[in-house]
Amino acid sequence: MRTMSKLLTIFFCLAFLAQTGVVLADKNPEELAKESESACEASAKTKPTIEMIKEKVDKACELLTKEGKAAFPKFKGKDSEFIFAGTYIWIHDLNGVMLMHPIKHKLDGQNVTGMKDTAGKFLFVEMNKVCKEKGAGWVDYMWPKPGEKEPSRKVSYVKLAKTPDGEMVAGCGVYDLPTAEVDKLLGK
């Protein structure tokens, strides 16, 4: 009887997970990006902390290390734990290809090494440099807040993950930190 109970529990868990995957698969990238952006904006009432950012990036890297690209759907949509406190996790590789951006899905598959912020900083080149040299670290640049067009100062924590699909960089950023705090993170 215990075996039957365990089998039924496993069956229902697998059925739930399969259904969750089907729900995500049914949404087109545009719908999922809008849902992700709405979730990000809705969660902005809570301000992210430096510790919160690092914790989420570390958790993202653990997930990527285990599952590789198969984990990407877990980073998108209104129920993603990786969309939080007005921010989100994105993933790119060391060649500068955006692998997964939950809000700007049109960047997925694009080489972003040529992207510069308004100050002329090649932000993804800088992020990859930090990851290659240190494994993880902070980078500051100008980037629009979710739902806005104009860029604001953002500082992001990026970390290298060795996954079944190769090396990937997971990143997450925060806006509106005091300049002194940003300078401290950057080692200035």
Task: State each model region's role.
Residues F12:
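RNase H-like DDE/DDD metal-dependent nuclease/strand-transfer catalytic core used by mobile genetic elements
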Residues R2-T9, T20-K188:
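N-terminal membrane-sensor/transducer module of prokaryotic signaling receptors
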